[in-house]
Amino acid sequence: MAELLNVKPTRMELLNLKRRITLAKKGHKLLKDKQDALVMEFFTIYDEALRLREELNEKMMEAFKALQRAEIDVGTLRMKEISLSVKPNREVEVKTRNVMGVPVPLIEAESFKRSAGERGYAFVSSSARVDLAAEKFEEVLDLAVRLAEVEETLKRLAKEIEVTKRRVNALEYIIIPRMEATVKFIKQRLDEMERENFFRLKRVKALIEARSGS
């Protein structure tokens, strides 16, 4: 049997508990609906994260292969010089948006893709393979930023799902059962009190009648 609430067995408390149970059940349904919607949203974004992760792995393999070819083409020393002369790329701004009421990151950034001139290294000392390697790594950066946003969103959704699940379970297995058990107890106690009063009145009536008869 569920633990009882510490309340007085009165009709006022009985009515109050019944109202609280109605509200708790409505709250439970709303939270359960929210939990189900969060889980659906989580798996939708999870599928996107898997796709992005797979695409990122492929792009990284392509980028490192392109880098190896570029290094063979211009030499290791020249490759280091080129990498040190590259200008800083785009700035990344992290904002917030809401997904099912959960604040999640929104990363705003222009594409990292640039022309050879924008990168800052001298075109004459470079090569087409160096440009291709740079382009491939810029594609990697674009995907990495998107994946970071998606994976952080998943973490926050997972946390909210866990919090919502605990609330649903608390209502379903602890709070509502306690209130229902207390309602049952109060009803039983009120019935007992009513029967006791009934028998007490009968005894009083019998005593009065006995005295009247004598």
Swiss-Prot record:
One of its GO terms (molecular function) is ATP binding. It holds the Pfam family ATP-synt_D. One of its GO terms (biological process) is proton motive force-driven plasma membrane ATP synthesis. Keywords: ATP synthesis, Cell membrane, Hydrogen ion transport, Ion transport, Membrane, Transport. It is found in: Cell membrane. It comes from the Archaea. InterPro entries: V_ATPase_D. GO terms for cellular component: plasma membrane; proton-transporting V-type ATPase complex. It is a peripheral membrane protein. HAMAP family: ATP_synth_D_arch. Has multiple subunits with at least A(3), B(3), C, D, E, F, H, I and proteolipid K(x). Component of the A-type ATP synthase that produces ATP from ADP in the presence of a proton gradient across the membrane. Belongs to the V-ATPase D subunit family. This is A-type ATP synthase subunit D.
